[in-house]
Amino acid sequence: MKLSNFQILIFSILFLLLPSCNPNYDLAGFLNGTSPEVCKRFEQSIAYNDSVGVPAVIVPSADYRVYVCTDSHIDSIPTNLTAFVQAAAADTLCPLALHLGDLVNAQGHIPYAVSLLPPNHSPLTTFLALGNHDIYFNQWDEWRSYFGSSVYWFYTMLPDSTVLDRFICLDSAEGTIGTAQLQWLRELLTGNGSQPSTLNAQHSSFRHTIVFTHTHFFRRDHSQQHTSNYAIEETYELTSLLEQGGVDMYWCGHDHSREITDYAGFTSIVVDALEDHYPPAFYMVATLSDQINYHFIQFP
């Protein structure tokens, strides 16, 4: 069906009026991305990492728990995120929690969402991945002012300095990690490249390696028709690299619906959305010991 000029005009007017009807609609970002692209965010993140070093999280024992959530989409209702933080903080075997992206829903809510997280120097250390909603409305600089980096890694160790597990966070907020970040990951996992081959490059030094980010590899669920995953070529490159690098698990969000896939020697888990008005909402609790076990907890 061919549209008339009048119909095109009406659709154009409605398209331009959408931001006034829905503040979550980022027209400027849709037409021309306002936050820096992944290559620039990667560059800024690595510069920050170089200034602070690699974090080490002290865990209470060789068997410890990690609480994992994603897609809280905070705007005004913080019930589920608050309950998640409280549950993790109350668990004496949980030294760290992960948020897999889309901390906020739209513009202006990052400071409020940050106020819901454990404060710095809390016994519960929180690490975040960057989601697509977190960079809408040119929010990257604000997000970076709180969290510093969207691409980083850290490791856990016992009080006697015995190194245990490695966690690697990737920036996939645009549905790609880009060539520079891919090379960084390759060097980190395989030691093939220019990075110093100290603790960071030898996966045999670690009991487990977990990669976490926002974007998923696989999606059989179609409840979120608009969500996208990586291009097929990037999926092939990344999954092959994770297999070569001895990665145990890949944790992500974005699709809002749980999906668990064993592929190429690792387990990929899409964690359910945490947001309040998206029932049923869940978070994941992973227990790391000689094996990695996990279960999901549903909010009432």
Model-derived features: where do they sit?
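Active-site neighborhood of divalent metal-dependent phosphoester/pyrophosphate hydrolases
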Residues: 61-76, 91-175, 208, 217-219, ...
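His/acidic metal-ligating clusters that form di-metal
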Residues: 86-96, 162, 166, 175-268, ...
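Short, basic, low-complexity termini and linkers enriched in Ser/Thr/Gly/Pro
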Residues: 1-20, 115-123, 161, 190-206
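Structured helix-beta-strand junction loops
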Residues: 122-124, 150, 197, 244-245, ...
